[in-house]
């Protein structure tokens, strides 16, 4: 079983896959702005998924980019997160990218990209 730890992360300590040179920077298009607007309105979200970057105090964001953007827009300083071990976190980030591509291909009607976050939440419930 993968050890998942509930933490609060400073928003300034988050790094994306693209910022590390491991992914593509995606533009903030109309669709993404719509998701962020909805999240800002809702105000309560599932925790993001992060992986610690060794000896740096920073975290790799593996799931939850839209939630982070909404939190920044709301001027929040921190966000609730689930910390995954590095190997699992990188695998989750890769899987999440594939699932987002599937969602995009089918007009975001399959909600495949939600699978990663739901899995992590279920894992924390099983540990309690």
Predicted regions: what is each one?
Residues 5, 96-98, 109, 113:
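A subset of signal/propeptide-processing and intrinsically disordered low-complexity segments
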Residues 7, 98-100, 124:
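Exposed, low-complexity/repetitive linear segments and helix-based recognition motifs
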Residues 102-128:
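Alpha-helical interaction elements
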Residues 32-35, 85, 108, 112:
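Compositionally biased, charge-rich terminal segments
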Residues 2-62, 69-72:
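Short alpha-helix boundary/capping and kink motifs at helix termini
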């Amino acid at each position: 079983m993968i050890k998942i730890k509930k933490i609060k992360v400073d928003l300034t300590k988050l790094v994306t896959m693209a910022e590390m040179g491991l992914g593509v920077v995606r533009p903030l298009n109309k669709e993404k702005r719509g998701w962020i607007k909805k999240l800002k309105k809702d105000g309560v979200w599932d925790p993001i998924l992060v992986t610690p970057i060794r000896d740096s105090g920073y975290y790799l964001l593996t799931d939850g980019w839209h939630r982070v953007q909404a939190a920044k827009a709301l001027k929040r300083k921190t966000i609730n997160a689930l910390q995954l071990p590095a190997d699992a976190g990188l695998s989750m980030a890769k899987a999440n990218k594939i699932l987002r591509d599937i969602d995009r291909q089918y007009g975001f009607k399959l909600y495949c990209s939600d699978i990663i976050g739901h899995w992590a939440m279920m894992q924390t419930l099983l540990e309690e």
